[in-house]
């Protein structure tokens, strides 16, 4: 199953990029700017959101720092980090399913993950976009908390770390991450545990609880520090935004969108059919729990309940999304289908084994599953090869424009300013501006920049009163250009940079 991933990863390590080496504009430029701050230990915010706040925390940026530095501060390091996170997540998911759920859960989980990669394309594993990076770590959290609920408290540290990473990287995963964690905790309450048909929990592994607590403290300290700082308040902004009484989606809309995101992708189902498939998945969870309860199988029983909690949280989250229910916002929900199918396979495993004893070909069922997995993985391998055989990606014209304008700004202030303040005019092409800022920083140009749009570039870019000039970046401004001493430094793709001398 991992052959396509390893093929692409090996190609990337030998110099074949999955994307242009420096997609120096837009979202990727913002990700790289924040990673550069993390390399200095100054990044306290998560990825920016189009709604004006930032996602809850910077775990993704700090995870990207080692490979970013090792690759010479190239964007390829962030792409490789995304691939590494995904490959390791797949390995952890399959390891947990195999250890606690047995061979049926392992084969079913591997088949579902292979189908997911076939749907998205193997190159998706190299996507550095934060909604994509959060998907597979959420899957690690799902199966990890299921193991904790089943009685394996040693799985708690990894489950907490994966849930925190997914929630900090993409806010949409936060409610479900909290829900599955709470479900696992509730299933350790003796009364709830008996009602759920789970065996009594063994003695608590104190080192696991201690390690999980330390991980939570370390991972969540940066966003808490930002919240408590005088110029901070991102977590309050998130809470306030989520509490706004604005337009929300109906239960029907949430069910349709959630059904498509959770299970519809498996068969390319339309919205109406996807809702029906979601009902089938919930019924399968009920069957899995009932069978596991009868056969006294703690892991599939716990996995079915934890997955159900995740589905409920996913539907509620979809109902509270502001604006259109775009697929990328809900993509993390696909891991709930992986959990549901694995729970059903694990629960039915003993029944299949007992029936197989009466068959003349007792390994037929396992063989069918492995053959199906091989077929899907073979298709993924073919897709990966087609990616590698395609033309090398080249930087876009927007990237070239950003580099040229940054070069003009750097040349214009080399002898006139030690540290200018950049002001971004309203209604400016933010994608291009981000590329300019990234290119300036990579050349070693010292500058400060005021927050603009949803972007808050702190650290060494924070204005501190030492700025000795002002650069206004925006659309052409004839009135500003006519002022005494104002000089046009450069213009590219409709973006103008004016040097305004100090008053």
Regions found by a protein language model. Name each.
Residues 141-158, 191-195:
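Membrane-interface transmembrane helices that cradle and orient dolichyl/undecaprenyl
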């Amino acid at each position: 199953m991992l052959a396509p991933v390893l093929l692409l990863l090996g190609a990337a390590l030998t110099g074949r990029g999955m994307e242009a080496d420096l997609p120096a504009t837009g979202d990727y430029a913002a990700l790289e700017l924040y990673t550069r701050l993390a390399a200095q230990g100054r990044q306290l915010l998560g990825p920016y959101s189009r709604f004006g706040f930032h996602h809850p925390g910077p775990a993704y940026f700090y995870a990207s720092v080692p490979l970013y530095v090792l690759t010479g501060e190239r964007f390829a390091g962030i792409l490789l980090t995304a691939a590494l996170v995904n490959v390791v997540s797949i390995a952890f998911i399959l390891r947990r399913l195999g250890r606690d759920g047995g061979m049926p859960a392992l084969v079913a989980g591997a088949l579902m993950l292979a189908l997911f990669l076939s749907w998205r394309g193997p190159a998706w594993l190299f996507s550095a976009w934060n909604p994509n990076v959060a998907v597979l770590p959420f899957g690690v959290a799902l199966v990890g908390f299921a193991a904790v609920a089943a009685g394996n408290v040693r799985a708690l540290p990894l489950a907490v770390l994966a849930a925190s990473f997914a929630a900090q990287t993409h806010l949409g995963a936060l409610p479900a991450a909290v829900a599955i964690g709470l479900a696992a905790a509730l299933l350790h309450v003796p009364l709830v545990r008996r009602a759920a048909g789970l065996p009594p929990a063994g003695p608590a592994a104190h080192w696991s609880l201690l390690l999980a607590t330390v991980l939570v403290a370390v991972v969540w300290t940066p966003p808490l520090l930002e919240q408590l700082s005088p110029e901070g308040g991102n977590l309050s902004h998130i809470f306030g935004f989520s509490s706004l009484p604005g337009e929300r989606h109906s239960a029907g809309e949430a069910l349709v969108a959630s059904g498509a995101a959770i299970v519809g992708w498996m068969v390319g189902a339309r919205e109406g059919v996807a809702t029906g498939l979601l009902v089938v998945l919930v019924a399968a969870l009920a069957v899995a729990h009932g069978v596991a309860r009868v056969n006294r199988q703690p892991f599939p029983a716990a996995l079915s309940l934890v997955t159900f909690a995740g589905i409920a949280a996913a539907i509620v989250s979809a109902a509270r999304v502001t604006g259109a229910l775009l697929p990328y916002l809900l993509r993390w929900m696909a891991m709930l289908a992986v959990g549901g199918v694995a729970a059903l396979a694990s629960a039915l495993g003993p029944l299949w084994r007992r029936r197989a004893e009466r068959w003349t070909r007792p390994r037929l069922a396992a063989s069918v599953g492995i053959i199906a997995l091989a077929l899907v993985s073979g298709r993924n391998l073919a897709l990966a090869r087609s990616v590698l055989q395609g033309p090398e990606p080249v930087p876009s014209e927007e990237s070239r424009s950003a580099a040229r304008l940054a070069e003009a700004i750097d040349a214009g202030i080399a002898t006139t300013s030690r540290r200018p303040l950049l002001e971004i005019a309203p209604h400016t092409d933010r994608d291009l501006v981000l590329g300019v800022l990234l290119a300036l920083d990579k050349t070693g140009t010292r500058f400060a920049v005021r927050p603009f749009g949803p972007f808050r570039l702190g650290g060494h870019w924070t204005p501190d009163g030492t700025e000795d000039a002002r650069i206004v970046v925006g659309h052409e401004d004839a009135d500003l250009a006519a002022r005494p001493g104002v000089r046009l430094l450069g213009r590219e793709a409709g973006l103008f940079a004016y040097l305004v001398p100090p008053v």
